[in-house]
Regions:
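Short, glycine/acidic-enriched loop or turn micro-motifs at the edges of active sites
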Residues: 103, 131, 240-241, 288, ...
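A short helix-to-beta-strand connector/capping loop
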Residues: 34, 151-152, 178-188, 201-203, ...
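Active-site flanking residues adjacent to catalytic metal/cofactor-binding acidic residues
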Residues: 99, 127, 236-237, 284, ...
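Core dinuclear metal-dependent hydrolase active-site scaffold
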Residues: 2-112, 182-268, 417-448
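Binuclear metal-ion centers of metallo-dependent hydrolases, dominated by the metallo-beta-lactamase
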Residues: 244-448
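Residue-level signal for inorganic ion chemistry
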Residues: 38, 165, 315
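Active-site neighborhood of divalent metal-dependent phosphoester bond hydrolases
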Residues: 146-189, 383-393
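Active-site metal-binding motif and surrounding structural segment of the metallo-beta-lactamase
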Residues: 88-98, 102-157, 276-280
């Protein structure tokens, strides 16, 4: 099922074909460009990077924050997680969809919009109600006040997120609640379902309600929407657990591997029935660092385990905390991709068959680590991964991934995202009858 907004800021922002028809495929030749792109405006957690506490006391600053003091182009400068999706339209233009609008949005827009050629915002989609996803909405007045760039911006979110914004920022919902000089943003609100497709600017964006910690009384999960974009890229910015029913929904949109690593065969009985596409990339939260016991953010062990279950061709890590430099994350990713393991992993790989992925329960505790994994009298920094020594971090990263995933498998393509990185892919279905279901259609402007 899908949900189409009743209105849009521009007439070319929506396809007119009904969901389930073949009009979209037939119209493809009229589109000069079928390339969709996503630019990271932010890849840091809610505190962003660097931290004030680090840069104001350089002698005690962590490696990632210290690096930003001397390099204004440092990849360790990270805003709140979010980005911009660019979608080609039938008339040759591109629509711009803003994904989240957090506390650091204004600085990110000032930096990246001119460099990337962005200006108009055709729509904004929100993942959840936290400040790092919504507290930059007021800054969108620069686009709409006195119609500086556009008259209004359509905002798409779930009921829970809308209600939180209405309670905290009532003037964004109704100008009757405003005070002051009257410089207000102008929004067209769309309250969206969390279990149906959203069709925005001709692009299918499928929300998945994932857990982002458990709070409240009685205890219940805070929901953060993950977005499957074009059945090609899954954006998971804030997650602590993916319920099994959501894995079942994902399997309706993408070809997921079995536990032996094999993908589903083509459907029988029809030579024209299209296979589900293989996921091109997952953008995934590692805000928990190397933790195996996440509260509100998973860490690297869970992120790799989720990527394995998704069978994603590429994995981009995001939502970084301070403590470990971008280069150290990159060094681990490259070595992991080459199939390197810890010393324990080298021994384990010869003793048992390892499934491609495993399931786990929410709140499941990690296995007790071997004492051989730690130095004598380990420091708190070592157990969390915040350590000045890159080799200690890399070793511990291998160990935690191996412990949580239940064993060692050959490496995957994994890279740390950074602010300003752009990934792009050919729209799903360009091949005849979808025969490109498993081919790689994605690349970025920095990594190979």
């Amino acid at each position: 099922m899908s949900y189409r907004s009743p209105s849009c800021a521009s007439s070319d922002c929506y396809h007119s074909s009904d969901e389930g028809s073949t009009d979209g495929a037939a119209a493809a030749p009229s589109q000069p460009d079928r390339t969709i792109s996503f630019t990271f405006l932010g890849t840091g957690g809610s505190s962003a990077l660097p931290l004030i506490s680090c840069v104001t006391e350089p002698d005690k600053a962590c490696p990632s924050c210290f690096d930003t003091l001397w390099d204004p182009a440092s990849k360790n400068i990270r805003g709140n997680t979010g980005g911009v999706i660019r979608v080609p339209q039938a008339d040759g233009t591109e629509a711009t969809i803003l994904l989240d609008c957090g506390k650091t949005f204004r600085d990110a827009a000032l930096n990246w919009f001119p460099k990337k050629g962005f200006r108009r915002i055709d729509a904004c989609i929100l993942t959840h109600l936290h400040a790092d996803a919504i507290d930059g909405l007021d800054d969108l007045r620069a686009w709409t006040y006195k119609s500086a760039i556009e008259n209004t911006i359509p905002i798409y979110c779930t009921r829970v997120t809308y209600d939180a914004i209405a309670a905290g920022f009532p003037y964004m919902i109704s100008k009757a609640a405003a005070s002051g000089g009257g410089a207000l943003p102008s929004f067209d609100w769309h309250i969206m379902p969390e279990d149906q497709d959203w069709i925005i600017c001709g692009l299918t964006i499928t929300p998945f309600p994932f857990h982002h910690g458990k709070y409240f009384r009685p205890v219940r999960p805070l929901i953060c929407a993950a977005f499957l974009i074009d059945s090609s890229v899954l954006y998971v910015s804030d997650v602590s657990y993916i319920p099994e029913e959501q894995w079942a929904r994902l399997a309706e949109y993408c070809a997921l591997p079995s536990q032996n690593g094999l993908f589903p065969s083509a459907p029988r009985g029809s030579s024209t029935q299209r296979r589900l596409p293989r996921l091109q990339a997952v953008v995934i939260d590692v805000g928990g660092g190397l933790t195996q016991n996440p509260s509100s953010h998973i860490g690297l062990p869970h992120a790799i385990a989720i990527s394995r279950r998704l069978g994603a061709l590429r994995t981009y890590l995001t939502d970084f905390s301070h403590g470990t430099k971008h280069q150290t994350w990159l060094d681990w990713c490259v070595r992991f991709g080459r199939g390197e393991t810890s010393d324990r992993g080298k021994r384990a790989i010869h003793h048992k068959a390892v499934p491609a992925w495993r399931t786990w329960l929410e709140g499941e505790k990690p296995p007790p680590p071997s004492s051989a994994h730690y130095p004598d009298n380990p420091s708190p920094e070592h157990t969390t991964g915040l350590n000045d020594d890159p080799e200690i971090f890399i070793r511990r990263a291998f160990e935690t991934v191996e412990e949580w995933a239940g064993g060692v498998l050959p490496g995957r393509w994994v890279r740390p995202a950074f602010d300003g990185l752009t990934i792009e892919w050919q729209r799903w279905g360009d091949g005849p009858n979808g025969v490109d279901w498993g081919s790689q259609r994605i690349k970025d402007d920095h990594y190979r």
